Regions:
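Active-site-flanking structural segment that lines cofactor/substrate pockets
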Residues: 28-46
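Membrane-interface amphipathic segments in extracytoplasmic regions
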Residues: 41, 64, 87-88
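Membrane helical hairpin/interfacial module
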Residues: 50-52, 56-81
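Beta-hairpin (beta-strand-turn-beta-strand) motif
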Residues: 58-60, 111-113, 126-129
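Polymerase palm active-site segment centered on the conserved acidic dipeptide of motif C
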Residues: 76-87, 207-211, 317
Length: 352
């Protein structure tokens, strides 16, 4: 099998690398299953050192094929999802990566950092590559933690992260908000408030759960900014501040416009700036659909967030998808996101 694959790597501007195994023979699920079986040691080594590996040229074409491939890598797949991104279930263990509109950027994040037991492994496959854009960039969050200005990192370490979420409910009542991506019944897959409360209690991270008028739910949770990698002990930037902060969208769109020069991104950046300014005037932090502060309620300094985004983008590897690609990620080391795109795109995800 080794003579039918080429091994290479993609590189970030800061020198981070992601390993790539490209098949030269006929594609197909049997070839991918054989590769995983024969190269399990290589795959585990790449995950332990570089944190991710891309398997290219195997021609995955359906969610069912991807589930079989993901199960070959990690037999114990999971399917409970308490995240904020809209996703559709395609098989019992495969979901659409996100149902957000194509113009909407998804900032870098390790999956479900705000839960007690985040996934250990994350796997994506590209079944239909976008005509332009739509990359799923990867960032080594160990390198981000090490590269942060010590003063900025210290403020995050001392201050921690406090996530504020205000959800509408199954009645659909309440104000419209572009920052509210799901209702609470969609996240928890129930309309029973007692079940929601039990699921939140099981996580052990929520300091406030409050039901409000109009069928609304407020959740506040507290988290550390960094986490020690469970195998190496390395410090990892492991939180959602760069995703959930009110300024996340304009911060991402400005950098995307600088990268692509697309007028769509420029227009969306300016719109997001104006929308965020209006939201700040109209509602306190506690009432925002999605926002985060430090643990004591103090706002995170804008300059600290901008520095964090700069470091993340410097370590970003953003290679275009090809049809049939599959990437395996150590979720405790490597983050992912999504760049805007044009044309049809289908990227699917599984985790363990």
């Amino acid at each position: 099998m080794s003579d039918t694959c080429d091994f290479s790597a993609f590189r970030s501007p800061a020198g981070d690398t992601v390993s790539v195994a490209t098949r030269r023979g006929d594609p197909g699920l049997p070839a991918l299953l054989e590769f995983v079986d024969h190269h399990r040691g290589w795959l585990q080594d790449q995950l332990a050192t570089r944190g991710a590996a891309l398997l290219r040229g195997f021609g995955l074409a359906t969610p069912a094929q991807f589930e079989a491939a993901a199960r070959a890598v990690e037999p114990e797949l999971k399917n409970e999802y308490l995240g904020t991104s809209p996703r559709d279930a395609l098989t019992p263990y495969v979901f659409s990566a996100s149902e957000l509109p194509p113009y909407y950027p998804i900032p870098q994040h390790c999956e479900m950092t705000f839960l007690k037991d985040p996934p250990r492994r994350l796997m994506f496959a590209c079944l239909v590559a976008a005509r332009r854009g739509g990359e799923t960039p990867l960032v080594d969050m160990r390198r981000v933690a090490a590269d942060l200005d010590p003063a900025v990192r210290g403020r995050f370490e001392r201050g921690g992260i406090r996530i504020i979420r205000n959800y509408g409910g199954p009645s659909g009542a309440g104000r419209f908000d572009l920052w509210q991506l799901k209702r609470w019944d969609e996240i928890f897959q129930t309309t029973d408030r007692a079940v929601v409360e039990a699921k939140c209690a099981a996580q052990g991270v929520f300091t406030d759960l409050r039901w409000g008028p109009g069928d609304r739910l407020r959740l506040i949770s507290e988290h550390e900014a960094l986490r020690a990698h469970p195998e190496t002990g390395e410090a990892v930037w492991f939180n959602h501040s760069q995703v959930f902060h009110l300024s996340a969208a304009p911060g991402e769109l400005r950098r995307i416009y600088a990268r692509t020069g697309e007028l769509r991104s420029l227009a969306l950046w300016r719109f997001a700036q104006a929308a965020v300014a209006a939201k700040r005037r109209l509602a306190a932090s506690e009432d925002q659909a999605l926002h985060c502060t430090h643990r004591d309620g103090q706002e995170i300094a804008a300059a600290d967030l901008e520095h964090l985004r700069d470091v993340i983008w410097r370590h970003m590897i953003a290679e275009p998808w090809q049809n049939g690609d599959m990437v395996v990620i150590d979720n405790f080391a490597i983050s992912h996101g999504r760049l805007p795109y044009h044309g049809p795109r289908q990227v699917v995800v599984a985790w363990a």
